[in-house]
């Protein structure tokens, strides 16, 4: 048990400090904006300090544990703790949220509510990644949905209400299965405190019941990740959301589904995961091809990037399904890698829209000359998205490939077939990625528009882009910086499996 409540402070600081926004003096949006950025920076620095000085990398067990009685009558506990699996997503959340807050500068309507919702979302995401209690995990999972719905419905495009409604129907529908499974799992055959992760991990279930729990949780995570065919909310949501919200969706929210799949399904329900893993591999392989084939047909720039996210998230599903050290480490690395790349692409798409007021690719063209900085950064992140060697996407996807090939669970021919189909998907990625850059930046279409004068990226946009680009290059050159966080925890998780 931790002697000082570091994690509790980290979880509650954003939402509590965010509540003070409504009491700030009415002197324009500048005070609100800088106050929010300072809170995000303080939270990020506090998180980094805690992990640097109080977290042991070589210990696969839960660290900085906190356990407080919450609701005595129901024996509910406030349990928090971190390990190598959660530390990466938590740091990613702090980094992306801070930059998304900086990116939200153009938002002026209801600025107080907007920034409060971003901070509330911050707390929900940190709470989900650090929860050690099934009920607390569910509460944080749901807490994070409400701000997203409001951010979509109030600061989106013309079809924002449709997109927000579709988002909440999909995610709340998936959460119903989570809500049904958690009480059953927490209360089944145990006299110890219910809902504790450790208690649930040591609990053995009948095979049929474990499969039922697994399938229910899988539906909830398949909506968030997303996994086909439960992905259709994502393109609509990204197409209408403000780009700072898109950064949080692509960078963090999608990763919560993959995290839950590892943390609960894989760690707490190993026998069912061993049964379902071939199906995860098959669905993930289909998803790579499907999303990469669908993306080129999208006229909307942000929808095309959204489908590329669906394709790249499939590598995480495949890595989790491989049940190997290499594959799971590759999946965790892809969670971090795509968090940076996806957030950056949506940010640059949004800044481009702010200048040319166009979102359809067939209406764009020729903006490379008037906006060379945006062109350079967008092209760089497009290269990262198509897994160019030397960047994080290449390392993550390559490790997932090795995880499939070295998996003893699958026969030789299925492994070759899956690898071949995934390779086709990787070939399709440059097609939609490079064609997107060609339609945006090359040609002369926008030069024929009267008064076509466009302002290039300013210091704020350049700063955000470089801050995201540096980790992408850093992880691509030295991936062990991220892998060292999770490697011991991955071995501990896979020790429950017979197929290593």
UniProtKB/Swiss-Prot annotation:
GO molecular function: any one? NADH dehydrogenase (ubiquinone) activity
Q: How does it sit in the membrane?
A: Multi-pass membrane protein
Q: Which InterPro entries match?
A: NADH_Q_OxRdtase_chain4, NADH_Q_OxRdtase_chainM/4, NADH_UbQ_OxRdtase, ND/Mrp_TM
The GO cellular component terms are:
chloroplast thylakoid membrane
What EC number(s) has UniProt assigned to this enzyme?
Answer: 7.1.1.-
Regarding protein family, the annotation reads: Belongs to the complex I subunit 4 family.
The protein depicted here goes by the name NAD(P)H-quinone oxidoreductase chain 4, chloroplastic
Query: What organism is listed for this UniProt entry?
Result: Chloranthus spicatus (Chulantree)
Q: What is the gene name?
A: ndhD
